[in-house]
Amino acid sequence: MKKLLLALFTLAATIGSASAQVEIGLKVSPSITSLRAESTSKNSFASDGSQFGFSGGLVVDYFFGENYAFSTGLELAGKGGSIRYTDYLNSGVGNGNPFPVSMKISTQYLQIPLTVKLFTNEIAPATRLYFQVGGSLNVPIGTRINGNKFYNDPVTGTENKAGDYIYFFDADALVAAGAEYTLGKSTKLFAGLGYHRGLVDIDHYFESKRGFSDVTIKNSSFGLDLGIKF
């Protein structure tokens, strides 16, 4: 019995020590998002404008040193933008009459950051800077094109779900920097700037369904990170 109590006490002490190294909080990030689009000159895919996005969710910082932390969490992130391209009345093979097409794509992602945060020593009372680098894994959960859940291809006349245009997975490179201010024993406020650069071609329609050549569409977003940790 004594050994069991000692083991439980040791386990509780270990958990308490470990929990002191973990900071959990909430974050919101208003952002400007866009799509980087390109293709061969026949279809001339290009970005056609940015849009306002918003993300927010849970932040978890696990410290493995006084100034170093593995940072992850779970966020809901809005991304997208407008793209333009040239289509043809004979289903895009390039011999018919060309005409321009523009479409606005908005996608909601579940996003899991996988990053390292580096903190400076205090640069002012209760204030230190942080630098964050890594990436994120993203799964789309909803897409709209021109504000609608369905989209009619202007050449084929086929109606598809907007989500059919988007690949089922995305991954970003992520860099961020900001400042963190300690309010009390464990409460901290932070603010910073972050840039997500998509690494995965999210086109799931133009090459596979329309036979376009070398189409690439990738996400980008630049945002303001605001949050609190407890």
Predicted regions and their residues:
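Bacterial Sec-dependent N-terminal signal peptides
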Residues: 1-27, 226-230
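Short loop/turn motifs that connect adjacent beta-strands in outer-membrane beta-barrel proteins
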Residues: 19-21, 66-67, 121-128, 183-188
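Short glycine/proline- and aromatic-enriched beta-strand/turn motifs that initiate or cap beta-hairpins
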Residues: 20-59, 229
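Hydrophobic, well-structured mid-protein blocks that either form specific transmembrane helices
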Residues: 94-135
